[in-house]
């Protein structure tokens, strides 16, 4: 068979590329190849699972915009495909004055990027997490965690349901 597109690599990037291509071009023959016996066995399967809100990116930058869109689209995909995730937020802690100054900068950056964030003093930090020692920090409410291997498997399922061809154990 001749394919219009062949995507090599069954991690989250390869899988999401194949799935997006199939959504945009349903008439095209698309093949996803993965050398391992399961999807997302390497980097995707070994990351921390954080759905990043974009705390560190310059206001108005493409990275900031993509993070904002990515949080929403990742959670929407999870909701639509019964993939559990935890919108637990992310706590960044300052342990000295210099880091506390950086927290203020990050807090401002988050506000400019329209990220829901809370600036915490030492008492607020301690009440949120009694085992943390710090001068303060920020709590990024939009951050979440998910098992990206589960996301990957569901995405491959959607890709195949749309007529895509996905093959494991292929080099």
Q: What is each residue range found by the language model?
A:
Residues 18, 22, 158:
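Gly/Ala-rich phosphate-binding loop of Rossmann-like dinucleotide-binding domains
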Residues 34, 87, 121-122, 168-170:
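Short loop/edge segments at beta-strand edges and connector loops
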Residues 22-46:
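Glycine-rich FAD pyrophosphate-binding loop
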Residues 138-171:
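Helical element adjacent to the flavin cofactor pocket in flavoenzyme catalytic cores
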Residues 1-13, 31:
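Beta1/beta-strand and adjacent pyrophosphate-binding region of the FAD-binding site
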Residues 49-124:
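Dinucleotide-binding Rossmann-like beta1-alpha1 core, especially the glycine-rich loop
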């Amino acid at each position: 068979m001749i394919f219009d597109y062949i995507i090599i690599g069954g991690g989250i990037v390869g899988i999401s590329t194949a799935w997006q291509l199939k959504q945009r071009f349903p008439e095209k023959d698309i093949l996803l190849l993965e050398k391992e016996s399961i999807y997302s066995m390497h980097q995707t399967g070994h990351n921390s699972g954080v759905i990043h809100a974009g705390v560190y990116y310059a206001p108005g930058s493409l990275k900031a915009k993509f993070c904002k869109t990515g949080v929403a689209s990742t959670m929407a995909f999870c909701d639509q495909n019964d993939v559990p995730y935890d919108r637990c937020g992310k706590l960044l802690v300052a342990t000295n004055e210099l880091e506390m100054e950086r927290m203020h900068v990050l807090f401002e950056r988050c506000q400019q990027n329209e990220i829901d964030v809370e600036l915490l003093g030492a008492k607020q930090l301690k009440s949120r997490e009694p085992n943390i020692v710090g001068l303060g920090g920020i709590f990024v409410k939009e951050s979440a965690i998910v098992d990206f291997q589960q996301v990957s498997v569901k995405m491959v399922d959607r890709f195949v349901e749309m007529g895509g061809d996905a093959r494991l154990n292929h080099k």
